[in-house]
Amino acid sequence: IIGCLIIVALGILDDKFGLDAPTKLVGQILAAGAMAMQGVTLVWLPIRGTFILDPTTSVLLTVLVVLVSINAVNMVDGLDGLAASIVMVGAGAFFAYSYFLSVANGYQRAALATLISASLIGMCAGFLPHNWFRARVFMGDTGSMLIGLLMAASSIMLTGQVDPAGLSGGTLLPAFLPIVLPLSILAVPLLDLLLAVIRRTRKGRSPFAPDKEHLHHRLLKLGHGQERAVLIMTAFTGLIAFGAVSTAFVPIWITGLGTALGVVAIASWALNPPKLRVHARNS
């Protein structure tokens, strides 16, 4: 709760006064540190069985995960309804898996992660009709950083505090789901963040300096409208996130085949914007 209060206060100040990147980073570290001090930390990682973290590494890694999640969601919030749609779908996949763990395996931490995921779904679903193109209400840094923090919190509660040894029944992939699933849920924002950092640092600019070369900007340049661009990026998020979840319930070859077909379908949709189809008909 303290971490959420800090991030909300930071977001309000940023939305009102436009804080510089170092100041925002310090505030985000304080929020992540407060969350870690309250016990929401990575205790172990599902690497070669169970790799237990020492207290210092646990806190530092937790802060890093929270910072990445906050800024990934914050950077992807560039179109009406985009951040809310991606987080809602990603939280839906996380809810499905954490609910399964809390009911089938009785993990208390999974139950808390389920609650946070359900809250995120409700927050985004209630906000989205007002934030859809043409938006009447905007999320701002306050909202995007808050839902990024909550995504990180639910992921940490499942990834680093649920022992993977009891999940898989001897099969390998489901044991890695607690660490794979958070990455898959934030795959689109994380990819956008990574490309932005590489792009800006290569140009000698700050990684936090704004530009018009994000994934959603590229979709707009291809000829998609804002609504279609949001739907395409949300579809990719849902495909990757629910594809990861499905590995716990169906044979991996079925998941792989379905995901591959989905990627082809969504990529074809993304590379065939309306203006290109109109041009093809007129030529």
Segments from the language model and where they lie:
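Alpha-helical transmembrane segments
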Residues: 1-9, 82-283
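Hydrophobic mid-bilayer segments of alpha-helices in multi-pass membrane transport proteins
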Residues: 25-30, 259-261
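Membrane-embedded alpha-helical core segments of multi-pass
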Residues: 2-10, 27-42, 61-71, 87-93, ...
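Transmembrane alpha-helix boundary signature
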Residues: 13-19, 36-50, 99-104, 159-166
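Membrane-interfacial loop-to-helix junctions in multi-pass inner-membrane proteins
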Residues: 16-27, 52-53, 57, 81
